[in-house]
Structure formats: structure tokens, C-alpha cells
Curated annotation (Swiss-Prot):
Record's protein name: Lipoyl synthase
Protein's cellular compartments: Cytoplasm
One family name in Pfam for this protein: Radical_SAM
Gene3D superfamilies noted in UniProt: Aldolase class I (3.20.20.70)
Species, as recorded: Leptospira interrogans serogroup Icterohaemorrhagiae serovar copenhageni (strain Fiocruz L1-130)
Catalytic activity: [[Fe-S] cluster scaffold protein carrying a second [4Fe-4S](2+) cluster] + N(6)-octanoyl-L-lysyl-[protein] + 2 oxidized [2Fe-2S]-[ferredoxin] + 2 S-adenosyl-L-methionine + 4 H(+) = [[Fe-S] cluster scaffold protein] + N(6)-[(R)-dihydrolipoyl]-L-lysyl-[protein] + 4 Fe(3+) + 2 hydrogen sulfide + 2 5'-deoxyadenosine + 2 L-methionine + 2 reduced [2Fe-2S]-[ferredoxin]
Cofactor(s) annotated in UniProt: [4Fe-4S] cluster
Residues that, per the record, bind [4Fe-4S] cluster 2: C79, C83, C86
One annotated GO molecular function: metal ion binding
GO cellular component: cytoplasm
Sequence similarity: Belongs to the radical SAM superfamily. Lipoyl synthase family.
Keywords on record: 4Fe-4S, Cytoplasm, Iron, Iron-sulfur, Metal-binding, S-adenosyl-L-methionine, Transferase
EC number(s) stated in the UniProt entry for this protein: 2.8.1.8
Residue span(s) of domain Radical SAM core: 65-279
Length: 301
């Protein structure tokens, strides 16, 4: 574990409510020599690659890896921003590894992936925010897997037009940028992000004709009405696909869970999302942005 994760957070610590049964996930790994989870893990370790699955302590890691799917994380494992809910380490990142895009492509080919999700830490230390690194990775994957769907889950890149153009030119199948939470909570939850800036990124991508996607994490203190307003904002800028999931506190020093949202509310929000124009809404307590990402394009309950 990166020692930077041990830095105390600045918010006041509170006791989270007890985790309900519907969120209790077994993380038991089978025999490491004969299971898909081990195959994915070994491939990632061999290529010295980072995944958001591990870095963000995703509860679905076992499930997704058993399906031979993973979300690659570019730019190292240290983020230049510090969000109170996120388990990715923050600090001063190392220089980009120029061979990382090639290794990600080799891993994708070895695993026979049909849908690759690529994200990154925030790299505000770079002029283009890491956009060219994304583009190079897409190019390498398409060389070896020309029919593979590629989803890019990008930071806001500070809405720099030159950086966004680099992303657009590599023509991802899905352009994903997560809003994460409602406008009121941004100062507490993601103080270095801006609500309007994230909407602008998605609006620009939608206007350019890309299939756009975003996600919200619930249970951080938002109201149901605020969630619906946020969904309306996303729909108004042309977002087609939406994911809604439950926030889970990674450690005792992170933002406490304010509420465990019951499954019925997620179902109701899915119906509401469809009613205001989203093409697909993937909503449930354990849903994450890249959970079953290959199915989300056509998912329509």
C-alpha cells in the first residue's frame, strides 16, 4: 500500500452507520493457479500496471476480474488532487512512463478483452493533464485489438480545449467523465474539482457527437431532490449513460458514509433517469462506473 494513503484527511471523523447485508461482499480468491481472477492479477503484475480496481479499493474487484475485465489506470498511482471519498493516494506523482501504453495494450491482448476501460489519476502537473498519454494508449490497443471497444474515463483536464482535442482525435467509443456528487457537496467531497467544469467537459464531448457517460456516488450527504437535479443537469448537457452507486468509506480517515441508500431508491432513480432521457441507467448499491461496462452500452431494463 502506498504510504501516502495514510495521510489523515482534514474533515472531522464520524461514525458511519452499520453496513447493511446487501452491501456485504465476499472477497475470497479461489486457487490462484486455476481461476480468471489470478489470470488477470498475474497479467497486471507482470506488466507492472495499475488498476483503479485495486487503487480505489473497489468492492467489485473479485467479480470483474473473474470476468477478465479490469479498468487500467494511467499516469501512475499518485493523484495530484485529494478528494475526501477516494482511496487513491495523493501527492507529487512520478514522471509518466513512456512504455505504459504499450504494456496496457499487451495486457489487453493477452486477456482477450472486448471492452477496455482506461482511466487515470489527475495529472495537474502536466500541461495536457495526461491527454496525450491516453491517446497513445488507445493507439497501441487498436493496433492489436482493432475490434475492441475503448472507453475513456477521463479527469476534467481543467477543460483545456487543446487537451480535450487530443482525446477527441483518438475517437473513443465511450467518453466518460464522472460528476461523482451533487453541486452542494463539491467543496467538501472534491474541493479541487468544479461542478460546472465537469458539466462543461461532458457538454463539449456530447456536442462533438461522442457517446457520453457519467456517474454519481450516493450516500455522502446529498438529498434525493439534489440527486434528481444533478441527473437533470447531466441529461441537459447530452449525457447518454449514467451509473449510480453507493459510497463506501475506504478507511476511517476518509469521508464517513452519511447514509446507506436502500436498493428500492436505486431502482426508482433508474426509472426516473429513463424518464428524463438517458439512454441507459445502471443503478444499484454496488454499481461503479466501469462495472459491467461492456454491457452498459446496450443495457435497457
Amino acid at each position: 500500500m502506498n504510504p501516502l494513503k495514510k495521510k489523515p484527511r482534514t474533515h472531522s471523523l464520524q461514525n458511519a452507520p452499520e453496513k447493511p447485508d446487501w452491501l456485504k461482499v465476499k472477497l475470497a480468491f479461489p486457487d490462484p493457479k486455476n481461476n480468471p481472477v489470478a489470470i488477470v492479477r498475474n497479467s497486471l503484475e507482470e506488466k507492472k500496471l495499475n488498476t483503479v480496481c485495486e487503487s480505489a479499493s473497489c468492492p467489485n474487484l473479485n467479480h470483474c476480474w473473474s470476468r477478465k475485465t479490469a479498468t487500467y489506470m494511467l499516469g501512475g498511482d499518485i493523484c495530484t488532487r485529494r478528494c475526501s471519498y477516494c482511496d487513491v493516494a495523493s501527492g507529487k506523482p512520478f514522471p509518466l512512463d513512456p512504455e505504459e501504453p504499450k504494456r496496457i495494450a499487451e495486457s489487453s491482448i493477452a486477456l482477450g478483452l472486448r471492452h477496455v476501460v482506461i482511466t487515470s489519476v489527475n495529472r495537474d502537473d502536466l500541461e495536457d493533464g495526461g491527454a496525450a498519454h491516453f491517446a497513445k494508449t488507445v493507439k497501441e490497443i487498436r493496433k492489436g485489438l482493432p475490434d475492441c471497444k475503448i472507453e475513456l474515463l477521463i479527469p476534467d483536464l481543467k477543460v483545456k480545449q487543446e487537451a480535450l482535442e487530443i482525446i477527441f482525435e483518438c475517437n473513443p467509443d465511450i467518453f466518460n467523465h464522472n460528476l461523482e456528487t451533487v453541486k452542494r457537496l463539491f467543496p467538501e467531497v472534491a474541493p479541487q474539482k468544479r461542478y460546472e467544469r465537469s458539466l462543461d467537459v461532458l457538454k463539449i464531448a456530447s456536442a462533438r457527437g461522442f457517446l457520453t457517460k457519467s456517474g454519481l456516488i450516493l450516500g455522502m450527504g446529498e438529498t434525493l431532490e439534489e440527486v434528481k437535479e444533478c441527473m437533470q443537469d447531466l441529461a441537459s448537457v447530452g449525457v447518454s449513460l449514467l451509473t449510480l452507486g453507493q459510497y463506501l468509506q475506504p478507511t476511517s480517515t476518509h469521508l464517513p458514509v452519511k447514509e446507506y441508500v436502500v436498493p428500492q431508491v436505486f431502482k426508482d432513480l433508474r426509472i426516473y433517469g429513463k424518464s428524463i432521457g438517458f439512454k441507459g441507467v445502471f443503478s444499484g448499491p454496488l454499481v461503479r462506473s466501469s462495472y459491467h461496462a461492456d454491457e452498459q452500452i446496450s443495457w435497457n431494463p
